């Protein structure tokens, strides 16, 4: 069985915003990936950006200042 890890999950109102976050993070070397929104959360578009909690802690300010509207930001364990 794989060990569970803490992740930060960002949800968005639109698919465009989710895709913008993916592009922004890749351009800035921020590790993460697009995933379906976990059942515990709800989001307008159904797509979320997931990154390890440590990565989010390191880049939280950069992400907040990037200009992409985030609907929710939740810490979850997968």
Regions inferred by a protein language model and the residue ranges of each:
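Short glycine-/aliphatic-rich beta-strand segments at the starts of folded cytosolic domains
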Residues: 2-11
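Short, flexible, solvent-exposed loop/turn segments with mixed acidic/basic and small polar residues
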Residues: 1-2, 34-40
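Short, charge-patterned binding micro-sites
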Residues: 39-47
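Short amphipathic alpha-helix segments
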Residues: 14-31
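C-terminal structural segments of small proteins and small subunits
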Residues: 50-78
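Small/polar loops that bind or transfer phosphate-bearing groups
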Residues: 10-13, 51
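A short linear hydrophobic-aromatic micro-motif
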Residues: 31-37, 71-72
């Amino acid at each position: 069985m794989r060990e569970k890890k803490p992740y930060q999950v960002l949800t968005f109102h639109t698919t465009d915003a989710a895709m913008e976050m993916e592009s922004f993070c890749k351009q800035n070397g921020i590790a993460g990936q697009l995933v379906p929104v976990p059942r515990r959360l709800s989001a307008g578009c159904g797509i979320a950006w997931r990154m390890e909690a440590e990565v989010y802690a390191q880049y939280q300010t950069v992400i907040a200042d990037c200009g992409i509207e985030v609907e929710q930001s939740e810490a979850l364990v997968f």
